[in-house]
Amino acid sequence: MTPTGTLYTVSAPSGAGKTSLVSALIDTTSNIMVSVSHTTRAKRPGEQEGVNYHFVSHEQFATMVENNAFLEHAQVFTNFYGTSKQWVEDTLAKGIDVILEIDWQGAQQVRKLIPAAKSVFILPPSRECLRERLTGRGQDDESVIDARMAEAKSEISHYVEAQYLIVNDDFDTALTEFRSIVVANRLALEKQQDKHQSLLESLLS
């Protein structure tokens, strides 16, 4: 019998390295996928439909909300983002783990709907390092970086709501810790019982 997959919410302040860690974990670990969110924002250069996001209109998004199609959804400035409930449920049923890259508010919504979900929070090693990373992107001016630093403090204040905490100082160490969380959950009794049901029955017969 194939055990159901585990749902992970991964949250972090902007610049903590969440997306890079999730990408590296997906590339080096079998049977785990990252959920592709629906969004109303415009597609940026280099982004692909169904890879980075599912791009929809405000009207389409509103209809999906009315139809209860989202596991969680949120408004960020003038745009909306949401996680497809059906896709997550179907993927977990196949025994594949799913990662949701969402903020603390989204993680709260998910935990209410799926209490078995595991929450991971990623921290930068210091405020100075976080600012250096944001500055190093070369995407924003100082006023935007100041705003992101203020947002980071608010996001970090919710770390206590997570079950697992990773400090992304050394990337390889953080990745190993992240992978260890996934492996440990796969070795949990209820998962192993489902996976090795026939073996256990034969050993006890």
Curated annotation (Swiss-Prot):
Reactions listed under catalytic activity: GMP + ATP = GDP + ADP
InterPro entries linked to this entry: GK/Ca_channel_bsu (IPR008145), Guanylate_kin-like_dom (IPR008144), Guanylate_kinase (IPR017665), Guanylate_kinase_CS (IPR020590), P-loop_NTPase (IPR027417)
Subcellular location(s) per record: Cytoplasm
Keyword Transferase on entry: yes
Keywords: ATP-binding, Cytoplasm, Kinase, Nucleotide-binding, Transferase
GO cellular component, one term: cytosol
Pfam family, one: Guanylate_kin
Residues the record lists as binding ATP: A12, P13, S14, G15, A16, G17, K18, T19
CDD domains named among the record's database cross-references: GMPK
Keyword Kinase (UniProt): yes
GO terms, molecular function: ATP binding; guanylate kinase activity
Main subcellular localisation: cytoplasm
Domain Guanylate kinase-like, chain residue ranges per copy: 5-183
Functional summary from the UniProt entry: Essential for recycling GMP and indirectly, cGMP.
PANTHER family: GUANYLATE KINASE, GUANYLATE KINASE-RELATED
Name under which the protein is recorded: Guanylate kinase
